[in-house]
Amino acid sequence: MEEFNVHKKLSLLIAGAAAGALALSGCSGAGSTGGGDSADNTITALMVGNPQMEDIQKLTADNFTKQTGITVKFTILPENELRDKVTQDVANQGGQYDVATVGAYEVPIWAKNGWLHELSTQSSADTAYDSADLLKPMVQSLTGEDGKMYAAPFYGESSFLMYNKDMFAKAGLTMPEKPTWAQVAQFAQKLDDKKNGVAGICLRGLPGWGELFAPLTTVVNTYGGTWFDKDWNAQVNSPEFKEATNFYVNLVKQYGESGAPQAGFTECLNTFGQGKAAMWYDATSAAGTLEDPNASKVAGKVGYVYAPVNKTEYSGWLWTWAWAMPKTTKKADNAWKFISWATSKDYEQLVGKNLGWSRVPSGKRTSTYSIPEYKDSAKAFADVTLGSIEHANPQNPGVQPRPALGVQFVGIPEFSDLGTKVSQEVSAAIAGSSSVDKALTDGQKLAEDVAKNYK
């Protein structure tokens, strides 16, 4: 992976608004409790509360624990809270967790600071693991400057547009394979039906650099904007950044879901999955849940197309939720056993056979897309998902050169705080208590302060 241009000091806290949900914690429930041997065979895992993580919590006790004798105590948190918790624990060397879900943004930075175990040694030595099968974009995003992998991808994703085929057919509308944002806005206007509780589109409005600004930064990119130009000049109040943000905010205010300022990935998944929105632009990983009839009312009724664009050919983001092992763990062997199991081919088979093939945590292994059962269950979205991942370009996601890697984020330590602070004001603009102009004027000042570290 191309070297990050990072500042030497990491701001230790990721700021962010609370996700508005209570933390859920649980234990795998297997094995005996108490006693030295039991404690030695128990590891702690911190993970984001997405469907794929909820699935692994269900499957661990009856499978991994029975096979290995290792009990896993899970703590599940909403995304913003997860980011705060894991950053505090890892950065402060708290040692509370043996494994944790982290993303493509954190891993290269934390690897540089020596906070994570490298996993290349274990993965290469384990022939059954078949590390060569892992998708290159995902491995590259989790690689440190030394060329070693510091987290194993659990599932990978880009972003695409999901739409309710029944609603489009009823309105006589046809969704193109590569829509523009202008077309999406027209569709949202025609399909918005607030009287019957249906939004034209669902878009994240919840503050957080990895919440609201995940989709919004891709809009900024395709509108010709960027957080910083190649010389580290802040561009937050540039015409392109402002045009993209105004477009996004107005689209949500006019045709978006109710409660948009508090809506993140989870809330939009529920809204769209309940048939309460005509379109949703978000993570490709949402498709598995949407196609599960036990979890979604729109299973079999969803169409999937590439992320909407304006000035670029593609605009999907690139992300992976991955399992990392903090340097502070005293149970590295058991932690690796869990990580290798959770990211293995066998685990994908386990999910497919027990929970349904559409729920396989995909986007990380080439072989996944050759499994007949998965191909059949994922035929509506597999090709667009893989194409979106392959076309995501963290080196050049927009129309101008960038000073650091990242599609929906800037690969520097300060971005977590910067992105979250600006997102809070943009969310306030969606709520009607502030304006885009104020949000970006204030954001420009914050970005200029960050840029001083790199000039």
Predicted segments, located by residue:
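Short, well-ordered beta-strand elements
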Residues: 39-51, 70-75, 98-99, 150, ...
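Conserved C-terminal helix/tail region of periplasmic/extracytoplasmic solute-binding proteins
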Residues: 71, 169, 393-455
